[in-house]
Protein backbone atom coordinates (compact mmCIF):
# COMPACT_ATOMS: atom_id res chain seq x y z
CA UNK A 1 0.00 0.00 0.00
CA UNK A 2 1.28 3.47 -0.84
CA UNK A 3 0.40 7.01 0.10
CA UNK A 4 0.62 10.27 -1.79
CA UNK A 5 1.22 13.68 -0.24
CA UNK A 6 0.28 16.98 -1.79
CA UNK A 7 1.83 20.41 -1.46
CA UNK A 8 5.41 21.69 -1.64
CA UNK A 9 8.20 20.56 0.66
CA UNK A 10 7.77 22.88 3.61
CA UNK A 11 8.65 23.24 7.28
CA UNK A 12 12.27 24.35 7.05
CA UNK A 13 14.54 26.96 5.58
CA UNK A 14 16.65 26.16 2.55
CA UNK A 15 19.55 27.90 4.33
CA UNK A 16 19.59 25.08 6.91
CA UNK A 17 20.55 22.67 4.12
CA UNK A 18 23.49 24.76 2.93
CA UNK A 19 26.46 22.73 4.17
CA UNK A 20 29.27 20.78 2.48
CA UNK A 21 29.51 17.04 2.01
CA UNK A 22 32.41 15.07 3.46
CA UNK A 23 34.98 13.30 1.29
CA UNK A 24 32.60 10.37 0.67
CA UNK A 25 29.63 12.58 -0.19
CA UNK A 26 27.82 12.18 3.15
CA UNK A 27 25.92 15.22 4.40
CA UNK A 28 25.41 15.87 8.11
CA UNK A 29 22.81 18.55 8.93
CA UNK A 30 23.46 20.20 12.27
CA UNK A 31 20.77 21.20 14.73
CA UNK A 32 21.38 23.66 17.54
CA UNK A 33 21.85 22.29 21.04
CA UNK A 34 18.94 24.40 22.26
CA UNK A 35 16.75 22.47 19.82
CA UNK A 36 18.18 19.14 20.95
CA UNK A 37 17.76 19.73 24.67
CA UNK A 38 14.13 20.76 24.20
CA UNK A 39 13.36 17.27 22.86
CA UNK A 40 14.69 15.31 25.82
CA UNK A 41 11.52 15.43 27.89
CA UNK A 42 9.40 14.37 24.92
CA UNK A 43 11.63 11.33 24.49
CA UNK A 44 11.41 10.53 28.21
CA UNK A 45 7.63 10.65 27.97
CA UNK A 46 7.59 8.52 24.81
CA UNK A 47 10.19 5.88 25.73
CA UNK A 48 9.73 4.20 29.13
CA UNK A 49 13.25 2.75 28.99
CA UNK A 50 14.66 6.31 28.94
CA UNK A 51 12.23 7.93 31.37
CA UNK A 52 14.72 8.24 34.24
CA UNK A 53 17.65 9.59 32.24
CA UNK A 54 19.13 13.00 32.96
CA UNK A 55 19.83 15.46 30.16
CA UNK A 56 23.51 14.52 30.32
CA UNK A 57 22.75 10.82 30.04
CA UNK A 58 20.35 11.51 27.19
CA UNK A 59 23.02 13.49 25.38
CA UNK A 60 25.51 10.64 25.72
CA UNK A 61 22.98 8.16 24.33
CA UNK A 62 22.28 10.38 21.33
CA UNK A 63 26.00 10.82 20.64
CA UNK A 64 26.53 7.06 20.84
CA UNK A 65 23.94 6.57 18.10
CA UNK A 66 25.82 8.86 15.73
CA UNK A 67 24.26 11.75 13.88
CA UNK A 68 21.46 11.50 11.36
CA UNK A 69 22.75 12.14 7.86
CA UNK A 70 22.03 11.54 4.20
CA UNK A 71 24.19 10.16 1.43
CA UNK A 72 23.15 10.96 -2.14
CA UNK A 73 24.30 9.05 -5.17
CA UNK A 74 25.47 11.00 -8.21
CA UNK A 75 22.69 13.24 -9.50
CA UNK A 76 20.70 11.80 -12.36
CA UNK A 77 20.52 14.60 -14.90
CA UNK A 78 17.62 13.14 -16.90
CA UNK A 79 14.62 15.45 -17.17
CA UNK A 80 11.80 14.57 -14.76
CA UNK A 81 13.84 11.77 -13.18
CA UNK A 82 11.89 10.33 -10.23
CA UNK A 83 13.40 10.25 -6.76
CA UNK A 84 14.20 7.31 -4.52
CA UNK A 85 14.69 8.16 -0.84
CA UNK A 86 15.70 5.15 1.24
CA UNK A 87 15.21 5.54 5.00
CA UNK A 88 17.46 3.39 7.17
CA UNK A 89 18.14 3.11 10.90
CA UNK A 90 21.90 3.23 10.38
CA UNK A 91 24.19 0.22 10.67
CA UNK A 92 27.59 1.63 11.49
CA UNK A 93 30.16 2.86 8.99
CA UNK A 94 30.63 -0.48 7.24
CA UNK A 95 26.95 -1.42 7.22
CA UNK A 96 25.94 2.01 5.92
CA UNK A 97 28.47 1.69 3.08
CA UNK A 98 27.19 -1.78 2.21
CA UNK A 99 23.63 -0.48 1.85
CA UNK A 100 24.75 2.61 -0.07
CA UNK A 101 26.79 0.58 -2.56
CA UNK A 102 24.03 -1.99 -3.05
CA UNK A 103 21.65 0.75 -4.22
CA UNK A 104 24.01 2.31 -6.77
CA UNK A 105 22.26 0.88 -9.85
CA UNK A 106 19.07 2.75 -8.96
CA UNK A 107 20.87 6.03 -9.64
CA UNK A 108 20.73 5.25 -13.37
CA UNK A 109 16.96 5.82 -13.23
CA UNK A 110 16.25 7.70 -9.98
CA UNK A 111 17.62 10.58 -7.96
CA UNK A 112 18.78 8.18 -5.25
CA UNK A 113 19.60 9.07 -1.64
CA UNK A 114 19.86 7.07 1.57
CA UNK A 115 18.90 8.93 4.76
CA UNK A 116 20.41 7.26 7.83
CA UNK A 117 19.27 7.70 11.41
CA UNK A 118 16.30 7.24 13.72
CA UNK A 119 14.98 10.79 13.36
CA UNK A 120 14.48 10.85 17.12
CA UNK A 121 15.19 14.55 17.58
CA UNK A 122 15.34 15.95 14.07
CA UNK A 123 14.08 15.26 10.57
CA UNK A 124 16.46 17.68 8.87
CA UNK A 125 18.41 14.96 7.05
CA UNK A 126 15.13 13.87 5.44
CA UNK A 127 14.02 17.44 4.74
CA UNK A 128 17.29 18.38 3.07
CA UNK A 129 17.43 15.24 0.96
CA UNK A 130 13.91 15.94 -0.32
CA UNK A 131 14.87 19.52 -1.09
CA UNK A 132 17.83 18.37 -3.18
CA UNK A 133 15.60 15.96 -5.08
CA UNK A 134 13.06 18.71 -5.75
CA UNK A 135 15.84 20.86 -7.15
CA UNK A 136 17.20 18.04 -9.35
CA UNK A 137 13.95 16.84 -10.90
CA UNK A 138 10.19 17.03 -10.74
CA UNK A 139 9.06 13.40 -10.90
CA UNK A 140 7.65 11.44 -7.96
CA UNK A 141 9.88 10.52 -5.03
CA UNK A 142 9.43 7.00 -3.66
CA UNK A 143 10.10 6.67 0.07
CA UNK A 144 11.47 3.24 1.05
CA UNK A 145 11.49 2.41 4.78
CA UNK A 146 14.23 -0.16 5.41
CA UNK A 147 12.55 -2.16 8.15
CA UNK A 148 11.58 -5.78 8.68
CA UNK A 149 8.14 -4.77 9.93
CA UNK A 150 5.73 -1.83 10.04
CA UNK A 151 5.07 -2.58 13.71
CA UNK A 152 7.73 -0.51 15.46
CA UNK A 153 8.45 2.98 16.74
CA UNK A 154 10.98 3.82 14.03
CA UNK A 155 8.59 3.29 11.12
CA UNK A 156 5.90 5.24 12.97
CA UNK A 157 8.31 8.14 13.51
CA UNK A 158 9.08 8.19 9.78
CA UNK A 159 5.37 8.05 9.01
CA UNK A 160 4.79 10.91 11.44
CA UNK A 161 7.34 13.00 9.55
CA UNK A 162 5.38 12.38 6.35
CA UNK A 163 2.03 13.17 8.01
CA UNK A 164 0.83 9.56 8.01
CA UNK A 165 0.68 9.30 11.81
CA UNK A 166 -0.93 11.75 14.20
CA UNK A 167 1.52 11.09 17.04
CA UNK A 168 5.31 10.98 17.11
CA UNK A 169 7.17 7.96 18.50
CA UNK A 170 10.11 9.82 20.03
CA UNK A 171 9.89 13.62 19.80
CA UNK A 172 7.99 16.28 17.91
CA UNK A 173 10.30 16.79 14.93
CA UNK A 174 9.53 18.87 11.84
CA UNK A 175 7.01 17.33 9.46
CA UNK A 176 7.23 17.60 5.69
CA UNK A 177 4.73 17.73 2.87
CA UNK A 178 5.77 16.91 -0.66
CA UNK A 179 3.68 16.73 -3.78
CA UNK A 180 6.20 14.19 -5.08
CA UNK A 181 6.34 11.71 -2.19
CA UNK A 182 4.97 8.16 -2.34
CA UNK A 183 5.53 6.26 0.91
CA UNK A 184 5.98 2.51 0.39
CA UNK A 185 5.20 -0.14 2.99
CA UNK A 186 8.08 -2.02 4.70
CA UNK A 187 8.96 -5.41 3.24
CA UNK A 188 7.26 -7.31 6.09
CA UNK A 189 6.39 -10.85 4.96
CA UNK A 190 6.39 -10.06 1.23
CA UNK A 191 7.00 -13.15 -0.97
CA UNK A 192 10.45 -11.82 -1.88
CA UNK A 193 11.65 -11.59 1.73
CA UNK A 194 10.49 -15.17 2.22
CA UNK A 195 12.77 -16.15 -0.65
CA UNK A 196 15.63 -14.11 0.81
CA UNK A 197 15.41 -15.80 4.22
CA UNK A 198 15.15 -19.21 2.53
CA UNK A 199 18.32 -18.37 0.59
CA UNK A 200 20.07 -17.59 3.88
CA UNK A 201 19.02 -20.95 5.32
CA UNK A 202 20.00 -22.88 2.20
CA UNK A 203 23.46 -21.29 2.23
CA UNK A 204 24.27 -23.02 5.53
CA UNK A 205 22.16 -26.17 5.08
CA UNK A 206 23.54 -29.63 4.36
CA UNK A 207 20.79 -32.01 5.53
CA UNK A 208 17.37 -30.31 5.85
CA UNK A 209 15.74 -33.49 7.14
CA UNK A 210 17.82 -33.18 10.33
CA UNK A 211 17.89 -29.41 10.59
CA UNK A 212 15.83 -26.94 12.57
CA UNK A 213 15.83 -23.26 11.66
CA UNK A 214 15.48 -20.33 14.03
CA UNK A 215 14.59 -17.00 12.40
CA UNK A 216 15.80 -14.24 14.73
CA UNK A 217 14.49 -10.67 14.45
CA UNK A 218 15.37 -7.44 16.23
CA UNK A 219 11.78 -7.01 17.34
CA UNK A 220 9.82 -3.98 18.58
CA UNK A 221 9.53 -2.54 22.07
CA UNK A 222 5.87 -3.14 22.90
CA UNK A 223 4.22 -6.49 23.48
CA UNK A 224 1.37 -5.64 21.12
CA UNK A 225 3.74 -4.82 18.26
CA UNK A 226 5.74 -7.92 19.07
CA UNK A 227 2.70 -10.17 18.68
CA UNK A 228 1.94 -8.59 15.31
CA UNK A 229 5.50 -9.05 14.08
CA UNK A 230 5.62 -12.67 15.21
CA UNK A 231 2.37 -13.32 13.37
CA UNK A 232 3.94 -11.84 10.23
CA UNK A 233 7.09 -13.91 10.71
CA UNK A 234 5.03 -17.09 10.94
CA UNK A 235 4.33 -16.62 7.24
CA UNK A 236 8.06 -16.56 6.55
CA UNK A 237 8.53 -19.65 8.72
CA UNK A 238 5.78 -21.51 6.89
CA UNK A 239 7.42 -20.70 3.57
CA UNK A 240 10.75 -22.11 4.77
CA UNK A 241 9.05 -25.24 6.09
CA UNK A 242 7.26 -25.87 2.80
CA UNK A 243 10.09 -25.00 0.44
CA UNK A 244 13.20 -25.84 2.44
CA UNK A 245 11.89 -29.14 3.82
CA UNK A 246 13.42 -28.40 7.19
CA UNK A 247 12.41 -30.44 10.19
CA UNK A 248 11.23 -27.38 12.12
CA UNK A 249 11.23 -23.60 11.66
CA UNK A 250 10.51 -21.12 14.44
CA UNK A 251 10.49 -17.29 14.50
CA UNK A 252 11.78 -15.36 17.50
CA UNK A 253 12.06 -11.65 18.26
CA UNK A 254 14.67 -10.39 20.70
CA UNK A 255 12.90 -7.06 21.36
CA UNK A 256 16.41 -5.67 21.53
CA UNK A 257 15.36 -2.18 22.67
CA UNK A 258 12.76 -3.32 25.20
CA UNK A 259 13.39 -3.21 28.97
CA UNK A 260 16.24 -5.58 29.97
CA UNK A 261 13.96 -8.15 31.58
CA UNK A 262 11.91 -8.46 28.38
CA UNK A 263 14.96 -9.01 26.22
CA UNK A 264 16.43 -11.43 28.76
CA UNK A 265 13.28 -13.57 28.62
CA UNK A 266 13.52 -13.72 24.83
CA UNK A 267 17.20 -14.66 25.02
CA UNK A 268 16.30 -17.45 27.41
CA UNK A 269 13.71 -18.77 24.95
CA UNK A 270 16.31 -18.63 22.19
CA UNK A 271 18.89 -20.52 24.25
CA UNK A 272 16.35 -23.15 25.28
CA UNK A 273 15.36 -23.72 21.65
CA UNK A 274 18.97 -24.13 20.51
CA UNK A 275 20.08 -26.30 23.43
CA UNK A 276 17.05 -28.63 23.39
CA UNK A 277 17.25 -29.27 19.63
CA UNK A 278 21.00 -29.81 19.78
CA UNK A 279 20.55 -32.22 22.68
CA UNK A 280 18.14 -34.24 20.55
CA UNK A 281 20.72 -34.54 17.78
CA UNK A 282 19.37 -31.88 15.46
CA UNK A 283 21.51 -29.39 13.59
CA UNK A 284 20.44 -25.85 14.47
CA UNK A 285 20.57 -23.19 11.76
CA UNK A 286 20.03 -19.54 12.63
CA UNK A 287 19.05 -16.91 10.07
CA UNK A 288 17.31 -13.57 10.37
CA UNK A 289 15.22 -10.98 8.61
CA UNK A 290 17.47 -8.25 10.00
CA UNK A 291 17.99 -5.52 7.44
CA UNK A 292 21.78 -5.35 7.82
CA UNK A 293 24.46 -7.93 8.40
CA UNK A 294 26.14 -5.38 10.67
CA UNK A 295 23.34 -5.01 13.22
CA UNK A 296 22.73 -7.01 16.40
CA UNK A 297 24.36 -10.20 15.13
CA UNK A 298 27.32 -9.94 17.51
CA UNK A 299 24.97 -9.62 20.46
CA UNK A 300 23.13 -12.73 19.28
CA UNK A 301 26.43 -14.62 19.23
CA UNK A 302 27.18 -13.47 22.77
CA UNK A 303 23.68 -14.47 23.85
CA UNK A 304 24.27 -17.99 22.53
CA UNK A 305 27.78 -18.44 23.88
CA UNK A 306 28.55 -22.08 24.68
CA UNK A 307 25.84 -23.52 22.41
CA UNK A 308 26.22 -25.34 19.09
CA UNK A 309 24.61 -23.85 15.99
CA UNK A 310 25.38 -22.43 12.53
CA UNK A 311 24.56 -18.76 11.99
CA UNK A 312 24.15 -16.98 8.66
CA UNK A 313 24.52 -13.35 9.71
CA UNK A 314 23.69 -11.81 6.31
CA UNK A 315 21.17 -8.97 6.18
CA UNK A 316 18.14 -8.66 3.93
CA UNK A 317 18.67 -5.15 2.54
CA UNK A 318 21.80 -5.94 0.51
CA UNK A 319 20.34 -9.08 -1.09
CA UNK A 320 19.53 -8.74 -4.80
CA UNK A 321 15.89 -9.64 -4.14
CA UNK A 322 15.53 -6.64 -1.81
CA UNK A 323 16.27 -4.40 -4.76
CA UNK A 324 13.76 -6.41 -6.77
CA UNK A 325 11.21 -5.80 -4.00
CA UNK A 326 11.78 -2.04 -4.32
CA UNK A 327 11.13 -2.25 -8.06
CA UNK A 328 7.99 -4.35 -7.54
CA UNK A 329 6.69 -1.98 -4.85
CA UNK A 330 7.16 1.02 -7.12
CA UNK A 331 5.33 -0.72 -9.96
CA UNK A 332 2.49 -1.67 -7.61
CA UNK A 333 2.21 1.95 -6.47
CA UNK A 334 2.04 3.10 -10.09
CA UNK A 335 -0.75 0.63 -10.78
CA UNK A 336 -2.67 1.78 -7.72
CA UNK A 337 -2.30 5.47 -8.63
CA UNK A 338 -3.65 4.76 -12.12
CA UNK A 339 -6.73 3.09 -10.62
CA UNK A 340 -7.38 5.91 -8.12
Where in this protein do the model-derived segments appear?
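Sec/Tat signal peptide C-region and signal peptidase I cleavage site
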Residues: 9-13
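Active-site-proximal alpha-helix that buttresses catalytic centers in soluble enzyme cores
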Residues: 14-340
